[in-house]
Amino acid sequence: MVRYAATEIAPAKSARSRGSYLRVSFKNTRETAQAINGWKLQRAQKFLENVLEKKEAVPMRRYAGGTGRAAQGKQFGVSRARWPAKSAEFLLGLLKNAEANADAKGLDTGNLVVKHIQVNQAPKQRRRTYRAHGRINPYMSNPCHIELILTEADEVVQKSEAVVREEAHLSSRQRGARVRRAITAA
């Protein structure tokens, strides 16, 4: 069995998928993966399909040197965004594979969340390009390994009103007044 980077996730309530030595840009795939991390499965799939149709853009945060600006990046609070189609296709394939694995395990596919997604660099593939005056330059590709884990979303439990009132933010002056009242009342 292959080791995943996230080990604390319960295997009974999760489904995994991974791809190794994928010939797709590491930098673009990393940015695309970070965009969908923590999202519900259906929303992540819809987002990647929209990226392929150029209806939504992937925010470029870390590897953004030379990236042009796109208005579609505003929803993520960035100005630099792109539409990495090949990365979106590879991630869509892995999401579909993980969904099928979850279905085979008997998990509720409508309640799945992208809990962990990680993109690592694979060994570079070397080719050559021929330049003027008989020189040769490297023509490298930067493949990657991708792993992702889907888990069933936890049920959201609403706090009681008494707890919410107790947790209300008080300034130091208000806390002091509350303590003085409690002391004089006792």
From Swiss-Prot:
Q: Which GO terms describe its cellular component?
A: cytosolic large ribosomal subunit
Q: Does the keyword Ribonucleoprotein apply?
A: yes
The reply to whether Ribosomal protein figures as a keyword in the UniProt entry is: yes
Which InterPro entries does the record cross-reference, listed alphabetically?
Ribosomal_uL22, Ribosomal_uL22_CS, Ribosomal_uL22_euk/arc, Ribosomal_uL22_sf
Q: Which GO terms describe its biological process?
A: cytoplasmic translation
Subcellular localization is given as: Cytoplasm
One molecular function GO term is: structural constituent of ribosome
The record's keywords, sorted A to Z, are: Cytoplasm, Ribonucleoprotein, Ribosomal protein
Q: Which domain of life is it from?
A: Eukaryota
Return the similarity comment: Belongs to the universal ribosomal protein uL22 family.
The record describes its quaternary structure and partners as: Component of the large ribosomal subunit (LSU). Mature N.crassa ribosomes consist of a small (40S) and a large (60S) subunit. The 40S small subunit contains 1 molecule of ribosomal RNA (18S rRNA) and at least 32 different proteins. The large 60S subunit contains 3 rRNA molecules (26S, 5.8S and 5S rRNA) and at least 42 different proteins.
Q: What does the UniProt record say this protein does?
A: Component of the ribosome, a large ribonucleoprotein complex responsible for the synthesis of proteins in the cell. The small ribosomal subunit (SSU) binds messenger RNAs (mRNAs) and translates the encoded message by selecting cognate aminoacyl-transfer RNA (tRNA) molecules. The large subunit (LSU) contains the ribosomal catalytic site termed the peptidyl transferase center (PTC), which catalyzes the formation of peptide bonds, thereby polymerizing the amino acids delivered by tRNAs into a polypeptide chain.
Recorded protein name is Large ribosomal subunit protein uL22
